[in-house]
């Protein structure tokens, strides 16, 4: 009888180990989207884990506009806002986000596989000037020409530099049924954007597509390195 109990206990422990190995790792995290010199709208966000949808939101916010001074001075940096709460949502391994670029007058789709160790990266804490911070803000940036970067940023923006997780050229969406009925420009009032910024962009041309890669790399290289004291 005792031998049977030991065998049963060992079998249960094995099942628990297997279950733990496959379980989703949970961490406090959030997401956001933005641009480095453009007006944009985020229109859909979906996160996946092991092939299943864990978060989906058909809609989102738009930013106010691109700063005149930054366009003239060629000052490029990622900015934007946060998304909806992700409380209780496991850390995803894949993301799909749809954004409208006012400069390009296009709707783009970004599809990206996220690092396998993303939960661990998000959980790592750092001492920064006597305070604790961690990189658990997943940020999606879209630049003119469809260039995108996926970054891992500090929760309170204290820990730097931002970590580049992925980059590439987003795919222009041509399969949206409503876009075929009403143009993207009409849906989002892009004509007003053109009136306000059209001449400015002609006078001060900006990079396009992968031309952004070295520019944004240089921006990150200038960020202070405040991740020197990880919390063990």
Locate each region found by the language model.
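Positively charged n-region of N-terminal signal peptides that target proteins for export
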Residues: 1-4
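Bacterial N-terminal signal peptides
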Residues: 6-15
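Short, surface-exposed binding/anchoring microloops in extracellular/periplasmic proteins
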Residues: 21-53, 60
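Tryptophan-paired
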Residues: 47-103
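Short, surface-exposed linear segments at secondary-structure transitions and domain or protein termini
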Residues: 65-71, 116-127
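Edge beta-strands of extracellular beta-sandwich domains
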Residues: 106-113
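Compositionally biased low-complexity segments at domain edges in trafficked proteins
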Residues: 122-193, 197-232
